[in-house]
Amino acid sequence: ISITALLSELSREGISRWRAKVGAEEANRISRQASSRGTRVHNIAESYIKNQEDHLEGVLPDAVEMFQSIIPLIDRIDNVHCVEGALYSDELKLAGRTDLIAEFDGALSAIDYKTSKRIKIWDHCHSYFMQGAFYAHAYEERTGIPVKDIVIIMAVENEEPLLFRETKDRWLEPL
């Protein structure tokens, strides 16, 4: 099972309540828009990390603006170990694809890019922390290289970006 499928299942009840509240058509529209925006910003960030000079070529202005807001955070990344790496944990029987394993402010971290239409608080990011904990654990399991930290870099529409930092051990237990 993928980490994404597992976490989706855990949050299914909340998503169902939200869909009932806003209606199926509106929920589908919002979901498509969020997914598309997230993919565009994620792709730019990946190209930027890989030092591809044309990382903004042909990209819509809203995605460029959101990406540019997170550049100061991305520039704190160094010593990249893995970009878009497929990972599997024999222990947890889970698989997934990490955005990035690299040093953030000098600490080897599982780094994930997120986008949001509005500012999120720490309490609304638990699934992100569990996802990051899985990536850190699976990377260590596969390579023998310890990854203790989780970093979530979140571009927020028309707002300053958010940075969440957690430790793997705190979020591995729920998995």
Which role does the model predict for each range below?
Residues C82-L175:
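Mg2+/Mn2+-dependent nuclease catalytic core
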Residues I1-A95:
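Metal-dependent nuclease catalytic cores that hydrolyze phosphodiester bonds in DNA/RNA
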